[in-house]
Amino acid sequence: MLDFGTLNDLFARLGHRGDATVAMWREGTEWKPISSKQMYGRVRAVAELLQSWGVQRGDRVALVSENRWEWPVIDFAILAVGAVGVPLYQTLTPEQMGYILRDSGAKAFFVSDKKQYAKLSAAGEVPTLEHVGVFDTGEFDNATSMPAVFEKAASLEEPDTAFDALLKQTKADELATIVYTSGTTGDPKGVMLTHRNLVDNLRFSTDGLHIKAGDKSISFLPLSHALARHLDYAIYGNDGVIAYLPKFDDLVGAMKAVRPEIFLAVPRVYEKVRQGTEGKAHGFKKTIMDWALGQGKAHRTEVMEGKTPGSLFWKLANKLVYSRLKEAFGGHARMWISGGAPLGMDSSEWFLDMGIRVFEGYGMTETSPVISRNTFDGYRIGTVGKLVPNLECRMAADGEIEVKGTAVFAGYWQKEEATKKEFTDDGWFKTGDIGKLDEGFLSITDRKKELIKTSGGKYIAPQPIEGKLKADGLVGQAAVLGDTQKFAVVLISPEFPALKRWAAQNGVTAKDDAALVNDPKVQAQYESIVKKVNASLEHHETLKKVGLVGEEWTVDSGELTPSMKLKRRVIVEKYKDKIKELYGE
């Protein structure tokens, strides 16, 4: 079990392992190692830079970057000098970037490239901002070149008594970071997390995961997301190795090259893997895959218990099908983790029948972030696992999950009233999620704020229905709507590569995506998908109308949060005319 008093203690362990490889980065097609002492030297170099800038204990220092080795170096350096890290998503607009920099009162700001630097230039005045550092080479007005700073790091790799003493000055209850929640509406709120919040959650959330020294993981989820950062800390704390991948599009090649033991992703990535696997299976290959899935289903209980079935048929299916899926993850993975949004029972069962237990967890930024998780020591499909021991949990009268403990955040930055609203009178944090506990395993039903109440007074939980729809390879995203209406409808953003393959096989031609979704054959196909899902729903939950949209929903186009959750209000506003058509208005 990890036992650190602060994140600085974690870094002290990370930085004193000599020549041991702790991180990897890609240059061209080659993956290069970063040793413990190299990381130590680089963090020292940035810490000295921050001190030369006059950054004091408690000052806020912001950071925006893709996943590259500079990210943890800056993060650990900020913590080393007792400052507070403020990570920003790369997808923020200049206006959003400016809001967070002003709201946090950032004194310094690190950006990765000219694109983010240009956003800063367009973000408006930030009165507190005094210094900017840029990772990439180039000419940037009034900014420090970080490559020049890192050149000095080689001379700082040996343990330094004064620097190590500086690390120890930070106390557990000091603020470590302010994480601005992406949110689906309004201005983001800054979640204040202390060192104690983070290290206590690390200590208990990783117990049962059996992370080993030398275990590798590819860091590709945005590190401004609390879960991605949490796992990186956990791997560093257990003497593992992190390979930083700046571009998600390069993930397939990275998995083959790095061969990670640990794979963390949001549900959408798992859905994409499933859709890609099913999309390649035609004719005899599909027959074999269906047979293998049948064998997996027959031996599901054994796989759930972490056993390898002894059946000759299962072993044959493993050789022909399951092993190839595992090879797509690099062939060495032994732990698959899903978080950030619900994975859905259908996807969980599909992977299980392919011989893979996906450990689904649950949490939020405000809980540092893990509330519960499945592990090798406790796994139940369809749940988000058992609670971390440093959190208590209770259910409100309406089923809302409420938690209390050392992982719960210190409050929202400069928003005392907003903080009060998130807690009960007796001090329990209201998660906003509906759930239930069964033999210690937590299940999430839906987001309280997303529950749909029809005009007939019936409640519909949209997420489970959306999960069932997305289990079909032709569905990219789905938004179930119907609040205050007589019945529920669904807007579907197709999985366009799969749809185009289907169209070619079924004699459908169209000049563009908009024309494709308006084709009668295509619409009939999606109506049949919805009809199949409707058969598993209560009468009041059934989707009466289907609307197809002619574009993919993405983070960049604004319909999804960085953790791939639907921005429902954005979708409702963007497609209000189409929704009116569905309701015959």
Give residue ranges: language-model regions.
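Conserved AMP-binding A3 loop
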Residues: 33-37, 176-202
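Conserved pre-ATP/AMP-binding loop-to-beta segment of ANL
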Residues: 19-21, 134, 155-180, 187, ...
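Conserved AMP-binding/adenylation subdomain of ANL enzymes
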Residues: 199-216, 223-322, 332, 357
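Conserved ATP-binding/catalytic segment of the ANL
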Residues: 387-454, 471
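ANL superfamily adenylate-forming
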Residues: 117-172, 277-324
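Conserved C-terminal "lid"/linker of ANL adenylate-forming enzymes
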Residues: 452, 477-479, 527-585
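Structural core segment of the AMP-binding/adenylate-forming
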Residues: 2, 52-53, 80-152, 525-532
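Conserved AMP-binding/adenylate-forming core of the ANL superfamily
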Residues: 23-76, 93-98, 150, 195
